UniProtKB/Swiss-Prot annotation:
Subunit structure: Interacts (via N-terminus) with magoh and rbm8a; the interaction is direct. Associates (eIF2A-like region) with the 40S ribosomal subunit and the 48S preinitiation complex.
Chain residue ranges for the region called Disordered: 1-30, 54-147
GO molecular function terms listed in the Swiss-Prot or TrEMBL record: ribosome binding; RNA binding
Biased composition (Polar residues): 118-141
Primary site of residence: cytoplasm
Listed GO CC annotations: cytoplasm; exon-exon junction complex; nucleolus; nucleoplasm
BP GO annotations: exon-exon junction complex disassembly; nuclear-transcribed mRNA catabolic process, nonsense-mediated decay; positive regulation of translation
Compositionally biased intervals (Basic residues): 85-95
SMART domains for this protein: Mago-bind
Compartments reported by the entry: Cytoplasm; Nucleus, Nucleolus; Nucleus, Nucleoplasm
Family: Belongs to the pym family.
Coiled-coil stretches noted in the UniProt entry, renumbered to this chain: 83-199
Official protein name in the record: Partner of Y14 and mago
Amino acid sequence: MAAPYVSDDSGKYIASTQRPDGSWRKQRKVKEGYVPQEEVPVYENKYVKFFKSKPSLPPGLCEADGTTGQAQPSKPDADASLSKTAKRNLKRKEKRKQEKGEREQVEETRQDLERVNISDTPVQKNVTSAHKNGSASSDNSAAEKAKKIKNLRKKLRQVEELQQKIDCGEIIQPSKEQLEKLARRKALEDEIEDLELDL
């Protein structure tokens, strides 16, 4: 809030004002050319000034036409201003959404098929429930196998790193455990291969 100025024959003054608590401020003399802090313009660099002076509408479009143009979706303009990477990322997102939608449709169809009963015989119901239990256990075993494969690959990677260190001369005399690790390489490879075939 700007303070009210009072001009007198002796100069310019900021009039006395009342504080919120009821007490009064003294009037203050103002030197010639003084600009109060609230009235000092905020510094703006040349780029800010340029963008503020830039019209919001494109050349040739007046205010009356501008309101109808804003109602239209600006999707094509947004694509034109994006970089190659941003466009690629948008395409990936759209592709993921489509794949997710397809997966959801497949999942819904699968669930619908599970709900449908062709015949209401008790034997058929027992078979389907046994099949569901078997598929759940097979899912668990598949997950366990995948986990085991991951662990075996990690061990194999460690063996390969150890072999490289020995070959390049970092390790001159490998310890007994290191030699045992190297000897297990073939067994690890065979076990990984067997587990991958089971999956």
